[in-house]
């Protein structure tokens, strides 16, 4: 274990309350219960927030006409926590759990789980030592994005029945906020959406006002995300968001995504493109230049993403028709959401059919947001704590 709260609770800071975004929840417990669980997640973040009055929300109700005919707008309630408060929230939450007697095993690597013996085997990373054993009565298996390959290995080992997931890959787009202000006034975390035959494409995880691009490292490869801080001292009048494709029909989505991401690496980091070098990579919230290699050609991105890159180019062209930002933009590549096939679980407690004391949650159950991940955990806990 090397962290807590996941990417959504450590660097993103936006809680999306929706039964159609962020992963499967309502199919297990129904719409009303799903909304209640997600509201409890919001309440937990509020409870441990050092300045809860700083939390703001966006709740759009109608689509604006000016995005037609190019886009649909996916509307949902979004709570903006402020990424500069997340570390304090995590520390407050962690202290609360310690006071309640929860044990944490830091800097330990789980090397195997034997569901049939209720046995978790773990040790110090890279030491080659004999693994220690921890036995459990109930197990909540809730790996983060960096544990998707481990989740896949467990699924393969036990031949778990699964539901295949689509590839989720694209780029992190960035431009001055002024071009998007009329849409931001409607929806802070706007999600523009297009549907094609086997590909859907959407804007994702929008950040405004004090918006910064974040570098992520997963499996030794660099990808990009974004976050927004709260407070005028952080404002940079920039907007960034992912442009993510959901590609169906690829035989091994995880392997395909890994290969595409590796093709987008250069000198130990990712790529940045701006037409005609109009823009350069932006500064992080710490004042450093975002780690990336600037390229004057779209060819390496096109080579990595193949025929699917045309959907991203079309999406940007359509945005330009609506928001008229000309060449005043850039993007970082790649942005990726690794998803392994979703295990089929019992609806009443998210447990495996053959191992009723093993419950899957979060990324292990193909969640794509901290709100749904947290709701998975609460839903399971309600069943376990009588």
Give the ranges of each region predicted by the language model.
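Residues forming the flavin
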Residues: 1-14, 18, 56-386
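Redox-cofactor-proximal catalytic regions of oxidoreductases
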Residues: 1-47
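Electropositive, gly/pro-rich neighborhoods at or near active sites that engage anionic ligands
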Residues: 22, 48, 52-56, 244
């Amino acid at each position: 274990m090397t962290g807590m709260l996941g990417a959504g609770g450590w660097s993103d800071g936006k809680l999306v309350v929706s039964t159609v975004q962020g992963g499967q929840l309502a199919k297990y417990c129904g719409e009303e219960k799903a909304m209640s669980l997600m509201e409890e997640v919001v309440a937990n973040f509020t409870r441990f927030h050092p300045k809860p009055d700083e939390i703001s929300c966006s709740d759009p109700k109608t689509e604006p006409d000016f995005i037609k005919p190019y886009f649909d707008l996916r509307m949902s309630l979004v709570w903006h926590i402020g990424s500069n408060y997340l570390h304090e929230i995590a520390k407050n939450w962690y202290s609360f759990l310690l006071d309640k007697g929860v044990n944490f095993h830091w800097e330990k690597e789980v090397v195997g789980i034997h569901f049939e013996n209720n046995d978790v085997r773990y040790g110090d990373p890279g030491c080659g030592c004999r693994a220690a054993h921890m036995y459990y009565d109930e197990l909540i298996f809730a790996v983060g994005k960096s544990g998707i390959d481990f989740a896949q290995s467990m699924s393969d080992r036990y031949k778990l029945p699964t539901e295949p997931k689509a590839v989720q890959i694209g780029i992190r787009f960035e431009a001055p906020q002024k071009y998007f202000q009329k849409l931001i006034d409607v929806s802070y975390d706007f999600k523009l959406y297009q549907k094609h035959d086997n590909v859907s494409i959407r804007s994702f995880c929008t950040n405004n006002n004090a918006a910064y691009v974040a570098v992520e490292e997963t499996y030794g490869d660099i990808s990009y995300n974004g976050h927004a801080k709260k407070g005028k001292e952080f404002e940079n009048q920039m907007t960034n968001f992912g442009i993510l494709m959901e590609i169906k029909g690829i035989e091994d989505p995880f392997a395909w995504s890994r290969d595409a991401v590796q093709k987008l690496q250069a000198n130990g980091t990712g790529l940045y493109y701006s037409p005609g070098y109009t823009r350069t990579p932006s500064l992080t919230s710490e004042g450093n230049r975002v780690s990336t290699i600037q390229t004057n050609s779209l060819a390496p991105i096109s080579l990595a993403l193949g025929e699917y890159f045309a959907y991203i180019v079309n999406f940007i062209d359509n945005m330009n028709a609506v928001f008229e930002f000309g060449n005043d933009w850039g993007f970082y590549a790649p942005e990726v959401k690794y998803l392994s096939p979703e295990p089929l679980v019992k609806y009443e407690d998210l447990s495996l059919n053959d191992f009723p004391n093993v419950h899957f949650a979060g990324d292990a159950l193909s969640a794509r947001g901290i709100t749904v991940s947290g709701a998975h955990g609460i839903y399971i806990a309600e069943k376990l704590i009588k």
